[in-house]
Amino acid sequence: MPQHALASRIGRIGVWHGGLGQVPGAVARRAAAEIEQLGYGALWFGETPATESMSLAGLLLAATERITVATGIANIWVRDASAAHAAAQTLAEAYDGRFVLGLGASHAPLVDARGHRYAKPLAAVRAYLDAMDAAPYEGPVADPPPARVLAALGPKMLELARDRAAGAHPYFVTPEHTARAREILGAGPLLAPEQAVLLESDPATARSLAREHHTRFYLELPNYTGNLRRLGFGDEDFAGGGSDRLVDAIVAWGDVDAVRRRVQEHHDAGADHVAIQPLATDRGLGIGQLRELAPVLIDG
């Protein structure tokens, strides 16, 4: 799928959700259908040591009619390149091109938990793309071919996303990173960062919830802290689940307008699409927050 067509298809606002693989299928289907009904253009989700992205993508595609479903990301260590190529072709052909294959090298602790050996991520992703391009496939072919994007944080992975994929899907980033990413990608490739959001206006409460439900976990992963160091953060920001400065930079908390401003900062920095991740502090999958935000982010 041409890059401009992909950006047009998914629109300017999507949803990133980490909980859809951890609930009964019926609950995930209802959530996906409502996210589509609210008008979000894409539904992104990750892959953990306890979930599998391709089967979840099929479930979400079957539950919806228009929204693009995107792996954000599928871990390259979980399945070989031929399997990823076949899965992407199958899903894109069966669901009218609504599937986007987001790929990434994940993180050493998560790869090790699956019994694999983590290797140099840039070389590993490049070799994986080579193998995908050479992989045979005997089923019906999607036309246009399924789009693929890369989880890219550092300059060299962003260059690979520019040269070998439709674009980049950075996670756990700031608008400053989005600006740097756009500079490397250039004008054409898709840039679709994730942005965590939390509708809570009390600073102490918001930061506490953000640490509990988001930053504390990700600050244990060296790829993210390495990227944050490039953005000017240091060890003092990584302790205790994140300094106030770091939490405020990573999580857009406050009222609806505060979230709108942060999303606009990403767009102003060069993002084509921003995937908001509602921090589900109430065990309700954050759907209530998505309902409140949709009229402002999508229609506003």
What are these regions (language model features)?
Residues M1-G300:
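Active-site-adjacent structural elements that line small-molecule/cofactor binding pockets in enzymes
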